[in-house]
Amino acid sequence: TQHLPYTRCKMAMSLDGRTALANGESQWISSELSRRDVHHLRAASSAILTSVETLLKDDASLNARGLDFEFKQAVRIIIDRKLKTPNQAKLFSIPGHTLIYTENDNDTRIHELENVGAEVVFLKNTESWLKEVFNHMAKEFEINELEAGSTFSGALIEQGLVDELVVYIAPILLGHSANPLVKLKELKKIGEAKQLKIMDVRQVGKDFRFILTL
């Protein structure tokens, strides 16, 4: 059997289950206290994981900041099948280790990314490529913090690669055209729905934080 890292998926949504407006605007759905809480989660993680699509959209730093205790920064991991990560991405200008998993063996692109500080891991494309990536990650990382969009997070949930959801719910309404929390395949029966177990609920600032296991 494959050994996989424990993967916690962090999400923030409105009361009507939306994460971003249709035009992509998503900043500051959750409160400042919730965002600070996320930095605690990051500090407790071995790796912070995202997709290249999320990186291209947000250019996030993927590090823990503003904490008043000592901790080791998590390794930043980008899942980037085609090596679309920009050489100028903000995270390359910040101290820390960045790891890119890809199925693209283009030596020129690999060397470009290595020159700006990335470690690039090539894994041959297979039907279970994402599981192979997670199996490889498990050699070094025990706890992953997943911070990505609804499509990538949904794909990992459907493949059984996510163990826990941390969902911040803000008391706002974004409307039916805004993006959903997670994109999963269409169900034909309620009985097919993925069951989750609520482990903890607490108020964080004006938001509520749910911790659920899958």
What is each residue range found by the language model?
Residues 1-2:
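Class I S-adenosyl-L-methionine
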